[in-house]
Amino acid sequence: MKNILLGILAFVAVFLVSCTNSKAENTQITNAHFKTGDIVPHYQVCMVNNAYMGKKQLEVKHDGKTYYGCCENCKLRIPQEENARMAYDPISHQLIDKATAIIAISDKNDNVVYFENKANYEAFFNNK
């Protein structure tokens, strides 16, 4: 009986370790192809945290537009808080809608910045 119990515990331990390794590898592969300055898809950005997440986020519809958040709390905040839906373009200093903005990774920590057009995006990253 003792040997059977030890065998089961060993199997469970191997299974848990293999699941952990697989998730870590998947995360690295997903984020590997975007770097600072790259334009990223809206659906991979948490618009509440202003962060590139590397995978599809939760879709939130508001006033006929689509926003994205990473959790249930973000889904609640997007319709209620204007700063979850709007951002300032760093070049024009105009308030723009995140749902229609060009979104790019701004630093090595996967924070994002929003632009009202491609010309502003190019001006921002050419001056860095």
Description of each model-found segment:
Residues C46, D89-S92:
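Short cysteine-rich clusters marking metal-coordination/redox-active sites
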Residues F15-S18:
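C-terminal motif of bacterial Sec signal peptides marking the signal peptidase cleavage site
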